[in-house]
Swiss-Prot record:
Activated by ADP. The gene is Nt5c1b. Residues 1-200, 218-238 are annotated as: Disordered. Residues 60-73, 115-136 have a biased composition (Polar residues). Residues 12-35, 161-174, 182-194 have a biased composition (Basic and acidic residues). This is Cytosolic 5'-nucleotidase 1B. The active site is at residue 428. Expressed at highest levels in testis. Also expressed in brain, skeletal muscle, kidney and heart. Residues 1-11 have a biased composition (Basic residues). Transmembrane segments: none annotated. Belongs to the 5'-nucleotidase type 3 family.
Length: 573
């Protein structure tokens, strides 16, 4: 060696000593760092926990800042190296690269590491801890090796019993649940509450009505309440309509249920007929008046299978049924029909004989009212009665006072052939269709004053009488046939048979009908002549009049009459 090189070497010796000491201090400093990383060539890098001066990891289950001994017992499956301490691996190539970059001469002259350092830093792969906790591919190394980072995959060397303590309550729950299931299997299965019987089940429409409107609702739903209720009501109506349609179709297919259903009372023209007006019960009445109620009931029970003979209103009721049949042919869903109600003060025990007689003649009478000796007049308005026909004049007068069109039925003295295809109804004018104001003048002042009065008030309509409403009902049904071009074949025909003179007092009558909007098919002005011969030609099913001598005259010719007890003529009869 030359002297110059020796001089340079001597000059660099202090620097070499300085570099060795710095390397030892740097190694010791790296071992004390909490962020030291384990790295091997081709393996995954994991962050290390805090270490002490000897290089062992300080483990703490709770605070992660202070060192405390673990309370859990070691597991059999755990390796011994994990139960003691984790030894930090020697600095990796990145650490040596920093020292090697100082000068190549330093690597040549640097002595090997001491044995004390080997005891704290081991590089043997046999004692190296397992770095992969899960079967996942290795992650690339961090770009900043000196920065601290926390990973979700912590080293398994932290407390090995932490997961067992967390899972123990869950295991106890599963064990208790399995025990409870096993215990329930052996126990008898009993129901703690009674089963709801099917009779208590109700559809939604009924259950909805049980709850009031006090339920709190959001403001946006409150505004839609009426519309929603309207939609629900419409849906319910559609369901009901479909149900009744299916029921009617079912009944039409059954031969025994082929009879038409009765119309709804609020639309129908209700005709209330007593049992003595519908059937001939003269002999039965004599037994009641002569022998009393008990004998009368015994007689009815004994003869309940004996069919009663037709009474004065029998043919009138048959003609009403023919009109209903014609209306149903033209209007299948028609509700403006005649509805016959049997209204009688007979007892319920007599009802069996009445039902047998009604069915025998094929009368479509579905509603009965048997009052058991009590007057049935109080039920007339409840049945929405338009016309009441009875053989008892006292009950008819009661009904007239109640404002219900009523008449007392009388049979003809001899049989007469009646038309079966057309309902024919004849009316008297004064005190029947019209009021009795004109009769007051005729009775008090004579016929001359009567004619002058009618001429003077020709354009003034007459006041209505008790049967005017029934004529309106007939006219309403007639218009239904006229709408189908059935005027000439209409099954209803009305007649006006009056003792007035057409020349002197007939104009006011016709103008009054015109003002009311009513049509009369035939108007017969007799000028005081008897009505019997005219009625024989008409052959009406019923003739309404307020004077008994006209009733008696018509009876002699066989006409079925109905006396209307209304007006001044009742005081003179």
């Amino acid at each position: 060696m030359s002297q110059t090189s020796l001089k340079h070497k001597k000059k660099n010796e202090p620097g070499m000593r300085y570099s060795k000491e710095s390397l030892d201090a740097e190694k010791r400093k790296d071992s004390d760092k909490t962020g030291a990383r384990l790295s091997t060539q081709g393996s995954q890098e994991l962050p290390l926990h805090n270490t002490d001066s000897r290089g062992y990891v300080v483990r703490n289950q709770w605070s992660r800042t202070s060192r405390s001994p673990s309370t859990g017992a070691p597991s059999v499956d755990e390796p011994r190296s994990r139960n003691t301490a984790i030894k930090v691996e020697a600095p990796n190539s990145s650490t040596t690269s920093r020292t090697s970059s100082a000068s190549p001469s330093q690597h040549e002259t640097s002595p090997p590491p001491q044995t004390s350092e080997k005891s704290s830093i081991q590089q043997t792969p046999q004692n190296r801890p397992i770095t992969q906790l899960e079967s996942q591919p290795p992650t690339p190394p961090e770009t900043e090796p000196n920065s601290r980072r926390t990973s979700a995959k912590m080293y398994t060397g932290s407390d090995p019993w932490a997961h067992r303590e967390n899972r123990e309550p869950r295991d106890l729950q599963l064990r208790d649940y399995a025990y409870s299931c096993d215990s329930r299997e052996g126990m008898p299965k009993t129901r703690e509450y009674p089963r709801t019987p099917p009779t208590e089940w109700k559809p939604y429409a009924q259950r909805r009505l049980q709850y009031g409107t006090s339920v709190d609702m959001e403001p946006e739903y409150i505004s839609d309440g009426p519309q929603q209720r309207q939609r629900q009501q419409t849906e319910e109506d559609e369901v009901d309509e479909a149900y009744w349609t299916s029921v009617s179709m079912l009944y039409e297919k059954i031969p025994s249920c082929a009879r038409p259903r009765p119309p709804k009372p609020k639309h129908a023209i209700t005709i209330a007929v007593s049992s003595r007006a519908l059937f001939n019960m003269v002999d039965d009445r004599k037994i009641y008046e002569e022998e009393g109620l008990e004998k009368y009931m015994e007689y009815q029970l004994t003869n309940e299978n004996v069919i009663l003979t037709p009474g004065p209103a029998f043919r009138f009721v048959k003609a009403l049924q023919h009109v209903n049949s014609r209306l149903r042919d033209l209007y299948p869903d028609e509700q403006d029909l005649f509805d016959i109600v049997l209204m009688t003060n007979n007892h319920a025990q007599v009802g069996v004989r009445l039902i047998n007689s009604v069915n025998h003649y094929g009368l479509l009478i579905d509603r009965f009212c048997l009052t058991g000796g009590k007057s049935p007049i109080g039920y007339l308005k409840a049945y929405l009665t338009n016309l009441y026909l009875s053989a008892d004049s006292e009950k008819v007068q009661e009904a007239i006072k109640e404002g219900i069109a009523s008449a007392t039925m009388y049979a003809g003295a001899k049989d007469m052939a009646y038309c079966d295809t057309q309902l024919r109804v004849a009316f008297d004018g004064d005190a029947v269709l019209f009021s009795d104001e004109s009769e007051h003048i005729a009775k008090d002042h004579g016929l001359d004053k009567f004619f002058q009065h009618e001429t003077l008030f020709e354009n003034k309509p007459l006041a209505q009488g008790p049967l005017k409403s029934f004529l309106e009902d007939l006219g309403k049904l007639q218009k239904k046939f006229y709408a189908k071009d059935e005027r000439l074949l209409c099954p209803i025909r009305t007649y006006l048979v009056t003792a007035r003179s057409a020349a002197s007092s007939g104009a006011r009558v016709l103008k009054t009908l015109r003002r009311w909007g009513l049509e009369i098919d035939e108007a017969l002005f007799l000028a005081g002549a008897p009505k019997g011969p005219i009625l024989v030609k008409i052959r009406p099913h019923i003739f309404f009049d307020d004077q008994m001598f006209h009733i008696e005259s018509a009876q002699k010719f066989g006409t079925i009459t109905a006396h209307v007890p209304y007006g001044i003529a009742q005081k003179r009869n």
